[in-house]
């Protein structure tokens, strides 16, 4: 909502924000938002909540459980809303030791979701899965109308077929999660507090100014106010993580 150049609102839709807890919203919040709209005497003056947008994992590295997704799905069904899941980091969510969701679950419980490629080792692109029948029919037309059509080709499909069928998509993401847990443990052992409890490839820690300066001499990390983000990826090596862990121990 803050880095997308108003792309959603540029299509004539309005974003209704809900407060999050560690990057997540709940079925109860969504139900309250929808109910508030339908309880209005004159709802025609207000924005109709029509689609719920979630990220898996969230921007904070946290995960929705299958139970939470099912509850949100049920609310969406009750109020006639679509459920969309942003899967830019899908591989890292599926590979987490705390995850209990599968791609099959997303296919059954959402209307639209996508399997992230660019952040998970693909050359380019994302794989969009549409399960809602009423959205499938005109989707290519929507793409054309909004200038979102790639030149015709077969390479994007080939790379996803190769990565998914071989299992490399899942294995590479899981490796990144395992390495992130090593970084997490190193910070925990050092007594460094975390801004949020994450079991995926993104770790958000709260460093002192001195600790930041020491690590910044060798490493690049995103400084988000009081919080610093350390990420692993499909390309991260064990040697790189071992070096970082050693330097964390020296803080």
Please describe what each predicted stretch is.
Residues 1-218, 222-236, 244-247, 251:
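Conserved PLP-enzyme active-site core in the AAT-like
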Residues 240:
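Short, conserved phosphate/pyrophosphate- and ester-handling motifs at nucleotide-, phospho-/glycolipid
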């Amino acid at each position: 909502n803050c880095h997308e150049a108003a792309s959603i609102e540029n299509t004539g839709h309005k974003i209704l924000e809900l407060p999050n807890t560690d990057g997540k919203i709940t079925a109860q919040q969504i139900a309250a938002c929808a109910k508030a709209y339908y309880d209005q005497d004159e709802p025609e003056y207000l924005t109709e909540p029509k689609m719920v947008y979630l990220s898996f994992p969230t921007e904070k590295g946290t995960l929705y459980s299958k139970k939470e997704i099912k509850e949100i799905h049920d609310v969406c069904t009750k109020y006639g809303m679509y459920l969309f899941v942003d899967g830019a980091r899908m591989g890292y969510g599926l590979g987490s030791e705390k995850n209990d969701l599968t791609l099959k679950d997303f296919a059954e419980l959402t209307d639209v979701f996508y399997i992230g490629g660019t952040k998970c080792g693909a050359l380019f692109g994302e794989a969009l899965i549409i399960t809602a029948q009423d959205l499938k029919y005109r989707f290519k037309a929507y793409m054309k109308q909004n200038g979102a059509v790639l030149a015709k080709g077969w390479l994007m499909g080939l790379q996803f077929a190769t990565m998914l069928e071989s299992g490399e998509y899942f294995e590479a993401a899981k490796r990144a999660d395992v390495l992130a847990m090593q970084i997490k443990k190193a910070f925990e052992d050092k007594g460094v507090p975390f801004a949020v409890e994450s079991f995926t490839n993104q770790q958000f820690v709260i460093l002192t100014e001195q600790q930041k300066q020491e690590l910044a001499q060798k490493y690049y990390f995103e400084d988000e106010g009081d919080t610093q983000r350390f990420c692993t990826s499909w390309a991260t090596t064990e040697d790189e993580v071992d070096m970082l862990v050693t330097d964390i121990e020296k803080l």
